[in-house]
């Protein structure tokens, strides 16, 4: 493993530890409890893990491991009713018939995560990839590569 890749993996591991130790569920009963946290990494051709399972108050964070590529986590618009909050900002916004995340780059220090807990169930989503790592730069509405994955909320 190159030094650059080792440094990136170390940073991701440290960020994951900080996020999982600092995230709380908020709200009334059980306020202050640590939310179960899952990290999903993606690159040009793979999502790891493709299926992630979290408890009802859990959360997911996405990390882009593909240099020079922008990724967008994309949910169908009908997922909005499954969220425990009405506003999916700042991480997701509605665009047509989908909710699309902020762009996720390999160099971006901000993370994209679920804005609030999802109801129990299984939710498919896509990761749209664009950028020079896949060829020419293109618009977010025209992904050059689409990866598919799933979240299972227990």
Language-model features: locations:
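Bacterial N-terminal signal peptides that target proteins for export
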Residues: 1-11
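Bacterial signal peptide processing site
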Residues: 22-25
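N-terminal edge beta-strand
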Residues: 30-61
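Beta-strand cores of secreted/periplasmic/IMS beta-sandwich domains, seen most often
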Residues: 50-75, 110-117
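Solvent-exposed coil/turn segments that connect beta secondary-structure elements
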Residues: 67, 77-79, 130-132
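Short aromatic-acidic-glycine turn motif
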Residues: 79-90
């Amino acid at each position: 493993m190159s030094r650059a890749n080792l440094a990136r993996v170390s940073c991701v591991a440290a960020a994951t530890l900080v996020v999982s130790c600092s995230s709380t569920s908020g709200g009334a009963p059980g306020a202050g409890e640590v939310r179960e946290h899952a990290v999903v990494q993606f690159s040009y051709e793979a999502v790891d893990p493709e299926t992630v399972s979290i408890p009802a108050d859990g959360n997911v964070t996405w990390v882009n491991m593909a240099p020079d590529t922008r990724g967008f986590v994309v949910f169908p618009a009908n997922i909005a009713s499954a969220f425990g909050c009405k506003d999916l900002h700042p991480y997701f916004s509605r665009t047509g018939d989908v909710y699309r995340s902020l762009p996720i780059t390999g160099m971006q220090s901000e993370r994209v995560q679920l804005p609030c807990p999802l109801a129990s169930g299984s939710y498919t989503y896509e990761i749209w990839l664009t950028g020079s790592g896949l060829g020419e730069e293109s618009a977010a509405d025209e992904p050059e590569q689409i990866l598919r994955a799933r979240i299972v909320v227990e």
